[in-house]
């Protein structure tokens, strides 16, 4: 049993690669992350741990730009994320130099997933302990896209998805409430999904919004607080309306 448990390239008798499963467990223990694709907007949101008083909070951002039209959020080991993000950025620039055109969102997703898969079957390495949510606008179609990859190298396209801590709760919320919206409504849906699992409201949330026209923009804490206040007001109004509704006889 111990041999299957430790060796990265050896399957257990029942078909498991334990090191990949342990990497998936690292993702489940990581920060919550959510991605939502709207009609003209894509939004990434992550759970933000409170930083020590003397630490520069800008140095611990969990949403990264890969190119002018692609961004990535991740859940899992931050050091692994840094390596994967740097490799993806180099690939984006290399593609521009070689092909003289920007990568598509699917292309860079395939590259990242391929890299993650390679690290599940090579000796002397271990799987990346992170799952990624990749958003952007394709340069040829101008359509928004959202993809997810995991430590096994699997990738898939989504309308909305979540990963990390309590991702099942967020995913259930998104399944019940997702509609293809635009602008502010897309941002609010991502924040509402995060508020399902994140305590202390907006101060523990990091949000990035991308549009075809303006590119990627990180929301300031004050902007997030405004959205949270609006969401809480809507929730209170809905509860009041429910209490005031006449009971059916």
From Swiss-Prot:
One CC-aspect GO term: proteasome core complex, alpha-subunit complex
Transmembrane annotation, as ranges: none
Matches recorded under SUPFAM superfamilies: N-terminal nucleophile aminohydrolases (Ntn hydrolases)
Keyword field: Cytoplasm, Nucleus, Proteasome
PROSITE patterns with a match to the protein in the record: PROTEASOME_ALPHA_1, PROTEASOME_ALPHA_2
CDD domains: proteasome_alpha_type_7
InterPro entries: Ntn_hydrolases_N (IPR029055), Proteasome_alpha (IPR050115), Proteasome_alpha-type (IPR023332), Proteasome_asu_N (IPR000426), Proteasome_sua/b (IPR001353)
GO biological process entries: ubiquitin-dependent protein catabolic process
Main localization category: cytoplasm
Function: The proteasome is a multicatalytic proteinase complex which is characterized by its ability to cleave peptides with Arg, Phe, Tyr, Leu, and Glu adjacent to the leaving group at neutral or slightly basic pH. The proteasome has an ATP-dependent proteolytic activity.
Known partners and oligomeric status: The 26S proteasome consists of a 20S proteasome core and two 19S regulatory subunits. The 20S proteasome core is composed of 28 subunits that are arranged in four stacked rings, resulting in a barrel-shaped structure. The two end rings are each formed by seven alpha subunits, and the two central rings are each formed by seven beta subunits. The catalytic chamber with the active sites is on the inside of the barrel.
Name of the protein in its database record: Proteasome subunit alpha type-7-B
Source species: Oryza sativa subsp. indica (Rice)
